[in-house]
Amino acid sequence: MEHDDRRASQVRAGNNRVVIRVEQIENNAVHEQEGSTTIASQPVTATHAAPVSMAHLEQFTDSDWVEPSDEPTGTAVFDATGDQAAMPSWDELVRQHADRVYRLAYRLSGNQHDAEDLTQETFIRVFRSVQNYQPGTFEGWLHRITTNLFLDMVRRRGRIRMEALPEDYDRVPAEDPNPEQIYHDSRLGADLQAALDSLPPEFRAAVVLCDIEGLSYEEIGATLGVKLGTVRSRIHRGRQQLRDYLAKHSSETAQSA
């Protein structure tokens, strides 16, 4: 199919900012179907998303910070009510979820380039199908999309090489970040990162989702589309392989010292 214009989307996460650039997409099929096309067997209305930048989040001060309330906001409103009027915009999706998606993508893929690609593809897929999303757990949906994209990538490429995070990379903490913490989180050590690299992709995904992202076994099962017993087995075997790897390499390091 020939396109009049191609959509170019780029997500860049790290160095305390995430920048999204989306160019207009139009094609003959869209015109023929009166503004609708089909992606992944789901009808999607063609939408033009404006450029988005999160760099302005660096400018937050204590006086700008709004205390959290019990009332749902942003995507939580849409998730809780299913109200189409509350459907999040591209800007809202990115602002609220980009860093968390990138964090998961990095832990799964182990390197910045693949993490950026996975983050980009996740948000493109989310934005194209958000109109068909059934209210439930929005973050769980993001976990599922990101993880499945990672596993698809691994199957295509074979083995993914893990790399340590750059020394100057900061990450968002898991819960209730304040302005000074919003782009800061702890990093995994190089040894643990290398140990994760040694795991089969399915084990790695289960361990990352459980021990780093903090998902329950039930949530991991829903994310990976496997039974609870399979989740337990993958996590158990993955942890055992991590212990074996770390013990072996710790011994080798001690002998060479």
Swiss-Prot record:
Location of the DNA-binding region in this protein: 211-230
Summary of the knockout phenotype: Reduced survival after heat shock (50 degrees Celsius), treatment at pH 4.0, exposure to detergent and oxidative stress (5 mM H(2)O(2)). Additionally an inducible protective response to oxidative stress present in the wild type was absent in the mutant.
Entry-linked InterPro entries: RNA_pol_sigma-70-like, RNA_pol_sigma-70_dom, RNA_pol_sigma70_r2, RNA_pol_sigma70_r4_t2, RNA_pol_sigma_r2, RNA_pol_sigma_r3/r4-like, WH-like_DNA-bd_sf
Motif segment (Polymerase core binding): 111-114
Segments for region (Sigma-70 factor domain-2): 87-153
Keywords: DNA-binding, Sigma factor, Transcription, Transcription regulation
CDD domains given in the database record: Sigma70_r4
Any GO MF annotation of the entry: sigma factor activity
One GO term (biological process): DNA-templated transcription initiation
Pfam family, one: Sigma70_r4_2
Region (Sigma-70 factor domain-4): 186-236
Gene3D superfamilies: 1.10.1740.10, Winged helix-like DNA-binding domain superfamily/Winged helix DNA-binding domain
Quaternary structure, from the entry: Interacts transiently with the RNA polymerase catalytic core formed by RpoA, RpoB, RpoC and RpoZ (2 alpha, 1 beta, 1 beta' and 1 omega subunit) to form the RNA polymerase holoenzyme that can initiate transcription. Interacts (via sigma-70 factor domain 4) with RseA; interaction is abrogated by treatment of cells with H(2)O(2) or detergent.
Entry's free-text remark on domains: The sigma-70 factor domain-2 mediates sequence-specific interaction with the -10 element in promoter DNA, and plays an important role in melting the double-stranded DNA and the formation of the transcription bubble. The sigma-70 factor domain-2 mediates interaction with the RNA polymerase subunits RpoB and RpoC.
Protein family membership: Belongs to the sigma-70 factor family. ECF subfamily.
Name the record gives this protein: ECF RNA polymerase sigma factor SigE
Gene source species: Mycolicibacterium smegmatis (strain ATCC 700084 / mc(2)155) (Mycobacterium smegmatis)
